[in-house]
């Protein structure tokens, strides 16, 4: 069945007809995304699905008597001036001051984090790290091969990745296991941009990425991309591994990147 996730009555009717034991919310509109200069513009449709779409699915689950609702979250969109250590956990505050061009995107991500565990009797948010794999991040790979993704400002920002089939496995596990709440679904090897980007270029058989200062990066790519490359924080998967009993097939992006690019 194909329907509009923003059509409340259609969503409610479809879920009631299916009468599922679990509702899994994976609605996004990210296909073809290429530029993050203005995240609020790039993610406008996805922001709607994360807010109105989430409300529609929660209402549908209530009407259908479905207690367990699992929603896709995101571990990666951080503040412009993050505090604390190198790694974040589910216990860290959800509220932070976002980049000016990403206010709506950040609010939509936070909305899912707060609303699903609160409104659903068994509400779970799986905050995926940076997804990669065949058909998921091919745009990035193409850009890296063309040397269109530079290391900005020293590449000191820390990222957490998750291979697409590992994310799917965690989601399947959460269908039957795990207390309500938030889980960070990332691999076990958070890494600085200055580590993972040159490695991806090497695996892809490309020349090393260019390096540009932060001021030039702001002109070329925008403030959000500069923040991601210089001040972002990684995430810990300890809770997901312990409470869901989930283990990533690719505990490091290094082996995952190799399998993705060469497979």
Which role does the model predict for each range below?
Residues 95-101, 140-162, 166:
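A conserved pocket-lining segment of Rossmann-fold NAD(P)-dependent short-chain dehydrogenase/reductase
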Residues 251-263:
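Amphipathic terminal alpha-helices
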